[in-house]
């Protein structure tokens, strides 16, 4: 049968990336406690593409996803990238999987068991320049109360929900990053609060006011000794404004002198 994709292309234009995206598959993710959490992963996978061929073989991306990634781990992601690089004769490959991750939470006073989902993802790259790199990301919703509003107001203070997105490299569990984020905010969020819980949360937040800047700085100091490379983005959905407040802080990984010469940069982005 004729292989149209492998036919020679006279245009001689290489492509930075070809692949597939928005592929949904059932997966399991390892938890800190040693278990496996079932969830649904949304995948993107692709490679660079040489100038000499007309097209890639898209079906091979699906084949490697089905073959390797029922369970997600750094080892499985690397094996998947090595496989697709070999099958498509590429020099670099990338895969990203986004998934909802469930965490168990007890209400602060009544101790009722609840479950809250956060958005998480793993992005893995394999190429000759950076080698194998995995970046993990999680977005954690929390609660902030404005320090200025509290100090200038005779009664109350404006407060709101905040999304904190952390991307990092290194051996950190999703659960540990979630805990660090929640401890940096005015208060965590809870799917369920009875009246004693609500009283506790609102009063504790009042005693622990945080700007978005405070959350970003406090979280940076906690993550700094734990990861060589990370990015923090704090977004506050202001309750008294039609706009959001934002704070961003990055820590970039140092690279060797040879890497600096070859890449003309002193630090490596971790996102």
Swiss-Prot record:
Q: Which Pfam families match?
A: GCHY-1
The EC category is hydrolase
Please name the pathway: Cofactor biosynthesis; 7,8-dihydroneopterin triphosphate biosynthesis; 7,8-dihydroneopterin triphosphate from GTP: step 1/1
Site label May be catalytically important, positions? 146
Is this entry keyworded Hydrolase? yes
Its UniProt entry gives the catalysed reaction(s) as: GTP + H2O = 7,8-dihydroneopterin 3'-triphosphate + formate + H(+)
Keywords from the named record: Hydrolase
**What is this enzyme's EC?**
3.5.4.16
> Has keyword Chloroplast?
no
Q: Which InterPro entries does the entry mention?
A: GTP_cyclohydrolase_FolE2, GTP_cyclohydrolase_FolE2/MptA
Disulfide bonds, paired cysteine numbers: none
Gene3D superfamilies reported in the protein's UniProt record: Urate Oxidase
Q: One biological process GO term for this chain?
A: tetrahydrofolate biosynthetic process
One GO molecular-function entry: GTP cyclohydrolase I activity
Domain of life, per UniProt, equals Bacteria
What function does this protein fulfil?
Converts GTP to 7,8-dihydroneopterin triphosphate.
Family, as annotated: Belongs to the GTP cyclohydrolase IV family.
**Record's PANTHER family?**
GTP CYCLOHYDROLASE MPTA
The protein's name in its UniProt record: GTP cyclohydrolase FolE2
Q: Which organism was this protein described from?
A: Coprothermobacter proteolyticus (strain ATCC 35245 / DSM 5265 / OCM 4 / BT)
């Amino acid at each position: 049968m004729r292989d149209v994709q492998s036919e020679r292309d006279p245009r001689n234009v290489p492509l930075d990336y070809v692949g597939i995206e928005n592929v949904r598959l059932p997966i399991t993710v390892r938890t800190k406690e040693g278990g496996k959490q079932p969830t649904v992963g949304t995948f993107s996978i692709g490679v660079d593409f040489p100038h000499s061929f007309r097209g890639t073989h898209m079906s091979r991306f699906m084949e490697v996803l089905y073959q390797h990634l029922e369970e997600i781990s750094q080892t499985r992601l690397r094996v998947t990238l090595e496989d697709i690089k070999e099958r498509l004769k590429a020099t670099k490959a990338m895969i990203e999987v986004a998934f909802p991750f469930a965490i168990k939470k007890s209400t602060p006073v009544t101790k009722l068991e609840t479950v809250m989902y956060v958005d998480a993802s793993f992005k893995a790259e394999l190429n000759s320049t950076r080698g194998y790199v995995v970046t993990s990301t999680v977005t954690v919703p929390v609660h902030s109360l404005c320090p200025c509003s509290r100090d200038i107001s005779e009664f109350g203070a404006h407060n709101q929900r905040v999304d904190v997105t952390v991307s990092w490299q290194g051996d950190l569990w999703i659960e540990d990053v979630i805990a660090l984020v929640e401890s940096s905010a005015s208060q965590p969020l809870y799917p369920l609060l009875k009246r004693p819980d609500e009283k506790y949360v609102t009063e504790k937040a009042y005693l622990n006011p945080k700007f978005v800047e405070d959350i970003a700085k406090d979280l940076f100091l906690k993550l700094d000794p734990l990861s060589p490379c990370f990015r923090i983005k704090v977004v506050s959905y202001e309750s008294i404004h039609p706009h959001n407040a934002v704070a961003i802080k990055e820590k970039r990984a140092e690279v060797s002198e040879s890497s600096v010469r070859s890449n003309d940069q002193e630090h490596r982005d971790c996102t």
